[in-house]
A protein has these predicted regions:
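Bacterial N-terminal signal peptides
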Residues: 6-17
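Sec/Tat signal peptide C-region and signal peptidase I cleavage site
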Residues: 17-23
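Boundary/entry segment of secreted carbohydrate-active catalytic domains
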Residues: 23-59, 64-66
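Aromatic-lined carbohydrate-recognition surfaces of secreted/lumenal glycan-active proteins
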Residues: 32-39, 165-176, 196-223, 241-243
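Aromatic-lined substrate-binding rim segments of carbohydrate-active enzymes
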Residues: 48-125, 187-201
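Aromatic- and acid-rich polysaccharide-binding/catalytic face
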Residues: 58, 63, 68, 207-217, ...
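An active-site-proximal structural segment forming one wall of the substrate-binding cleft
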Residues: 85-92, 96, 129-170, 194, ...
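Substrate-binding cleft of secreted/luminal carbohydrate-active enzymes
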Residues: 99, 103, 236-341
Length: 341
């Protein structure tokens, strides 16, 4: 199986580079980023951006914004918060980049309100949401719902593609965390096919910006490998929502070669650091795993002010560690061809 996947990957790369030798470059500002909470207000995030404005070891920020807050009615968008973040980042004394992560679920919700635009809750979209193990998540395996998520990504991509401080877009994690029995029509293959549609559409909308698909789990290693192939073909970035030393997600297993070809020199790679791993590991242990094993280029560190002891919190643990300039991979990934620094 490994030999077959490696051969298939080699052929894919050959075809890809033959077809896209003159492809335009992609913005490339790898490094350590601070990641804000979905529940942080715009004003709070703007204050926090000022606090890290002079920190040379921090390359930028990731903001997490709910789909509901970005699309106020079908096809009507409110990007005022994104505009404000970019303006604040440009005003800082050191260069800072922006990654926007679109949130299409709520892990702890008891109500469907405020997650996706209200029109999606109609029968046209089968209610738009489905119950997950702990909350609600958009029905992303269904083409009608994915069509609307693609429309949102496309609108953001087209608006900010030309902004040099806009590093790109990120998704929520690929797993939907559904309980069994699965909803009618759901399968790993169906979900993977819709993610591939998203990857292709976003690259068309923003050819020089990054698109971070949070490939943590999708239920099938072969489907996950197919997603890596689609990211290769479109010059997208694989990612994930956690960095847990010695405990890889399915996506991390695939890109490090546990099931076949090793993608670490070929794909742009990223992952977030959440409070779960900070309870068990120090920032240095997490970074060592990310650098030596996962070989990621972008790390999004949660601005943790509530979990763990002082060594795991932002002001007293994470930020002091980042000031030591811990190593991170910066090489332009093979699939990108040209990186714009």
């Amino acid at each position: 199986m490994k030999g077959f996947l490696a051969s298939f990957l080699f052929c894919s790369i050959t075809i890809f580079f033959t077809a896209s030798a003159a492809a335009q470059g992609i913005k490339w500002h790898p490094g350590h980023y601070v990641m804000f909470s979905t529940d942080d207000s715009t004003s709070q995030i703007l204050r926090n951006i000022e606090e890290i404005g002079a920190e040379t070891s921090i390359k930028g920020v990731q903001v997490r914004i709910r789909w509901y807050d970005l699309e106020t009615a079908k096809g009507l968008y409110d990007f005022s918060a994104i505009d404000a973040y970019l303006a604040k980042l440009r005003a800082q004394p050191t260069r800072k980049q922006l990654v926007v992560r679109i949130i299409d679920r709520d892990f702890n919700a008891t109500s469907t309100a405020g997650i996706v635009p209200s029109y999606l809750l109609s029968s046209t979209y089968n209610g738009g949401l489905v119950r997950s193990k702990t909350g609600y998540v958009a029905r992303l395996w269904e083409a009608a719902v994915m069509d609307r998520l693609i429309a949102l990504h496309t609108a953001i991509g087209q608006r900010y593609e030309g902004d040099t401080r806009f590093e790109g877009l990120a998704t929520e994690e690929t797993t939907l965390a559904l309980s069994q029995p699965f909803p009618a029509g759901y399968s790993s293959a169906a979900l993977g096919a819709q993610y591939t549609r998203l990857v292709t559409a976003v690259r068309a909308a923003m050819p020089s910006s990054n698109f971070f698909l949070y490939t943590n789990f999708v239920g099938s290693a072969s489907v996950m490998d197919g997603l890596m192939q689609s990211l290769m073909a479109t010059r997208g970035a694989a990612g994930g929502s956690n960095i847990v030393p010695s405990n890889k997600t399915q996506g991390q297993q695939v890109w490090t070669g546990d099931f076949g070809a090793d993608y670490r020199l070929l794909l742009a790679l990223s992952s977030s650091v959440e409070t779960g791993e900070l309870r068990d590991y120090t920032p240095r242990q997490i970074n060592d795993w990310a650098y030596n094993t996962l070989r990621v280029h972008h790390i999004f560190w949660v601005r943790n002010t509530w979990s763990g002891d002082a060594s795991r919190r932002w002001d007293t643990g994470i930020l002091p560690f980042l000031r030591t300039n811990p190593p991170i991979r910066t090489r332009c990934p093979g699939s990108y061809g040209v990186c714009i620094r």
